[in-house]
Amino acid sequence: MITTKRDKWIYIGSLILLAAFLILKVQRGFTVSEEEGGIWNIVQGLFVCFGLFACFNLDRSKTNNPVIKTYRGFMFTVWAMAFPVVLFTGKMGISTIFHFITIPYGFLCFLWFYSCGIKNDIRKYSYLLYPTFLVTFVILFTALRSFYFLSDEKGAVADVYYIVGLLPIIFIYTPKKLRILPFLLACIAVMMTGKRTGFLALATIFILYFLPSDPDDRKPFIYRLLALLVLLIPTYYIITRLTGSFDLNMFDRLAKLGEDGGSGRSERWKKVLHTMLYDQSMLPLLVGHGYGSAYKFIGGHVHNDFLEFFYDYGFMVLILYISLFVSLIRECIKMYKAKFTYAREFGVAVIVSVFLAMFSFYAIDCTHITCCSVCLGLILAEWYKYQNGITHE
């Protein structure tokens, strides 16, 4: 495959926009008086436009993948169901129009970077994404202490999920023997912010990514496990000192994983389920209550994408959303069976996506899904080229 200079500049420009989005979003998260909106919204709008452009310009053969077809069907079904609500509510302000346009943001961002990955080798541009990962970590690290002194609001620390979401692509850019280092940085960031969902995701990644045998690694399993534990001991010490100085009590929070911890998740989940299963007729079960209803009903996100889509759009969209993750897992299994180079990294992206969808927000909000969409799109593009014997010249 021959990549033109124009293609390369388009891809580089996209990665620069991605870097700007992540850095500005994390900075915004620690500015307590910041109003909604900003240049990151412009970047989101650009990714939507780029994704729509890719929809009409990618050959059908390149999008004939179960993940892409399922994802496309899910997001555009949601978009179509949201349209009447937005049209007939009479509230057609700029904010409403923007949120309506960005409903399929995750899919369009994924499709755009899939298109870029088809035309370019993802390893050539590591110098753009790796610094973004490090800069985002530094911003998070330096701003957290002052943030806790400025406000009692803890929501902004969820920006750590941008760091966790970038891990799959960072693993690709890191030599195998050093991949534990960005993972440890992500661990430190998650422990500092006190995000238990992030901790569970990283624990799962540790078990499924680092512990299983690598075909190229001839070291016995016990040696690999001991080496990882040796690295984790000083990391535990650093994290303990940091969380102690920030008064985060992270390990107390981990000991209470079954409790709510102040986020209101359990009460929101109970309220949504009770309303859908006991207080409704059959019609809301099938088609939901309409775009944004769950957010208005409980005064915020449900912190579970499955329940929020169920409340807003009904059982049909819930099934489509579940089928999206089923297709991702199936594709990951195919990659493992084919011994695809980036199968493990694709698995990491799926793990992060599943945990965000279950305990935070993923496709329901155009924020954390950005990094996961980039990783899934780029790796799936490499998978397409692997299956079709396509190489770059």
Where are these regions (language model features)?
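Flexible juxtamembrane loops connecting transmembrane helices in multi-pass membrane enzymes
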Residues: 221, 236-271, 293-296
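Hydrophobic transmembrane alpha-helices and their immediate junctions
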Residues: 7-8, 60, 315-354, 386
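Hydrophobic alpha-helical segments of polytopic membrane proteins
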Residues: 2-3, 14-16, 168-241, 319, ...
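N-terminal signal-anchor transmembrane segment
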Residues: 1-59, 78-90, 102, 138-154
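Long extracytoplasmic/lumenal interhelical loops at the membrane interface
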Residues: 259-313, 334
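Transmembrane alpha-helices of multi-pass inner-membrane enzymes
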Residues: 346-354, 363-393
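Aromatic-anchored transmembrane helix interface
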Residues: 40-49, 67-86, 90-115, 128, ...
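Alpha-helical transmembrane segments of multi-pass inner-membrane proteins
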Residues: 48-51, 105-147, 154-213
